[in-house]
Amino acid sequence: MSPSFFLGFLSSLILVIRGDPCPCEREELCQQIRDERDFEVFVFDVGGKTWKSYNWSVVTTVATFGKYDAELMCHAHSKGARVVLKGDIRLAYIVDQNNRTGWITEKVNLAKSQFMDGINIDIEQAVEEGSSEYFALADLVKETTEAFHKEIPGSQVSFDVAWSPERIDKRCYDYIAIAESCDLLFVMSYDEQSQIPGDCIAMANAPITQTLNAYDQYLNLKIAPQKLVMGVPWYGYDYPCLNFTQNNICSIAKVPFRGAPCSDAAGKQKAYSWIMKQVSSSLSGRLWDGVQQAPYFNYKDPEGQIHQVWYDDPESICLKTDFVKAKGLRGVGMWNGNILDYSDDPVARQQSAMMWNALFGC
């Protein structure tokens, strides 16, 4: 019996024993991905079929935040990329050990039944340092990682963290313990205006100095750089201006958030595909803020109100992702992969390709 025949027979036998029919054209595509890549490109997918237009030559992990798509799983596996579950749970519930174990067991079984390769834990709740939830969260990550690694060898467990470990949005987590337990931290380097302590004005979603300094804060906690994935935004914020000055200062509504008087909740998130269409017909065209190292533009809505849109594009993104290799981080990712324009329009296709390329620096 040849080794290849034996491995194929064994794979089929495992699937039969498991009892879950493989939805892929080839049964080997239902086998979990175990290979590690030197550089991680971590994509959040929120549903639909735009994943068919991703740059699969670079994608290593897809975190599925939409409805389960067996076709996506099969395709990702054919490209050697992982597909991982979303994990979210109310922290007060998993303070109880039995509840925590039950949740983990449910997620492991779900991942197995869907032939998936791990889990991305996305818990963005406020936590007080030293509280029962504080310790329960660290335990959850540790126990989830242990269970997945045991039940699905080679699986990946990741945890999403705020752009800085400095109590952002009152998320006081045990970052050191969490980083030690899981395979990687996805640093969400966006929504950095969720708490605006000073003037209520429109600003960049991810200003460069603030963004990069925050990685030094994580590294100063002795978290290994190989545990950190830089997440960049493929979206921006559209702010209605209550007052607009000749110096392009846009005053925004006071929308408090978790103790701060103002926040980016005064604006609306807009996809990069929308932004590229809007900027071409805007009042100002693309402008550049040299301090925040970010693009923005101004436009007038049908009611005559001026809006200011802050966003990231290939120029601002690559300035940040240059830092990834300079510091030896694990890789890059984005929120989210679906919101580029993947249509047949040649201009849109070029814009989308440039966004993918920017993940690797300037």
Where are these regions (language model features)?
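Alpha-helical scaffolding within the catalytic cores
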Residues: V46-T50, K67-L72, G102-K107, E166-Y175, ...
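A cross-domain feature marking catalytic cores of carbohydrate-active enzymes
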Residues: D45-G47, G66, L85-I89, I123-Q125, ...
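Glycan-binding loop/region signatures in secreted carbohydrate-active enzymes
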Residues: P23-F39, V43-F44, V232-F323, R349-G361
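Conserved, mostly hydrophobic/aromatic
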Residues: V62, I121, L185, M230, ...
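Substrate-binding surface in catalytic domains of secreted glycosidases
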Residues: T105, Q125-Q278
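Active-site and adjacent substrate-binding regions of carbohydrate-active enzymes
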Residues: D122-E146, P153-F159, W163, H307-C362
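Glycan-recognition patch characteristic of GH18 chitinases/ENGases
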Residues: D20-K112, F135, E143, V347-Q351, ...
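Cleavable N-terminal signal peptides of Sec/SRP-targeted secreted and luminal proteins
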Residues: S2-G19
